[in-house]
Amino acid sequence: MANIVFKLSDKDITTLMSRITFDTENLPQGMKARAKYQNTTVNIYQSGKVMFQGNHAEAVSKELLPQHSQLNTNKTKKKNMANSFLEQTLMYDQFNCIGSDEAGSGDYFGPLTVCAAFVTKEHVPILKTLGVDDSKKLTDTKIVELADQLVTFIPHSLLTLHNEKYNIQQAKGWTQVKMKAVLHNEAIKNVLEKIDSSQLDYIVIDQFAKREVYNHYALSDIPLPKKTKFETKGESKSLAIAVASIISRYAFVTYMDQISKNINMTIPKGAGAKVDVIAAKIIKKYGLSHLDTISKKHFKNREKAQKILKPL
C-alpha cells in the first residue's frame, strides 16, 4: 500500500477540500479532515500535511493536487538527506528493520510502555516528510500528531505495564531491566507475527542493557539473534527506533493526561521536586494507596512526598 505526503498551504488545503467531500467531525487529535476517495484515504492534518494512503495513492494525489507532483516528495527527501539526523540513520534506513524502544522508565508517575515497529526502506521518505525524529526532541503535541498517523500504516506492537502490575513485579524482585527485556522481546515477537520475516534485515533495540544481560532477563530467546543489534541513543540512529519511541511515548503521554483528568491535577513527568509536591497532594486528598495505583512505588519520590506531609 502506497503512502504519499504533501505539505500544503492553507489556500491549497481549502482548494483540496472543495474538490471532494471530507469528514471534519470525530477525528483523532491533530487531524483536520478525512475522506475516502477511489479506494484511497486522504487525511489532512492541522500541521498542513496531507497524506494519501492506498494502492491508488499516487494517481489520486495527482488528480486532486495537479499543481503538485511526486517530484515534490523526492525534492523533500533530497533536502532532508543534508541534515544530520538522516546522515546518522542512513545505514539502518537502507534496510527493513524492526526497532524497539520504551517510555516511562524514568518517570515516577505513569506506566512503562514499550513499542516495536517495522519500518521498511519504502517507509523512509514518508517518515522524513512527516517529520519523524527522536521523540525526546519533540513536544507532546507533536508526538500525539505523529503517532496518530504512524499507527495507521506502520506494523507495530505496543505493550503497557500498568502501575499496579509494575509494582507487583518489582516487589517480586524484578528490576526495570528485566521488565524492559521481557516487554521488548514480546513486542518484537508480536511484530514478527504480523510481517513476512524474510523481508526483515535487522532488529534494532534501543540499548538499555548489554546483549548478555538482555538475554538473561528476557525469559525467552531473542527471536532472530543474528539479525539483532543493540544501539545506544538508538532513536538518532534508526528510524525504526524513532517510530517505536514516538508510539511508546504517545501511549505514556496519553495515560498521563488521563491520570491528570481523573484526579483534577496536572501530573508532572520525571522524578524531580515538582513530582514530590504533587505526590504529597495526592496522598493528602486521596490517600497513599491511591497514589500507589498511579506510580512506581520503589521510586524515592514516594518517601519524599510522605516527608513533605509530616510538618502539616
UniProtKB/Swiss-Prot annotation:
Superkingdom of the source species: Bacteria
One of the record's GO cellular component terms: ribonuclease H2 complex
Main localization (coarse): cytoplasm
The EC number(s) this enzyme carries: 3.1.26.4
Subcellular location field: Cytoplasm
Cofactors named for this entry: Mn(2+); Mg(2+)
InterPro entries named among the record's database cross-references: RNase_HII/HIII (IPR001352), RNase_HII/HIII_dom (IPR024567), RNase_HIII (IPR004641), RNase_HIII_N (IPR024568), RNaseH-like_sf (IPR012337), RNaseH_sf (IPR036397), TBP_dom_sf (IPR012295)
Record's catalysed reaction(s): Endonucleolytic cleavage to 5'-phosphomonoester
Top-rank EC class of the record's enzyme: hydrolase
Cofactor: record remark: Manganese or magnesium. Binds 1 divalent metal ion per monomer in the absence of substrate. May bind a second metal ion after substrate binding.
UniProt key word ATP-binding: no
PANTHER family, A to Z: RIBONUCLEASE, RIBONUCLEASE H2 SUBUNIT A
Name of the protein this chain belongs to: Ribonuclease HIII
Organism: Staphylococcus aureus (strain MSSA476)
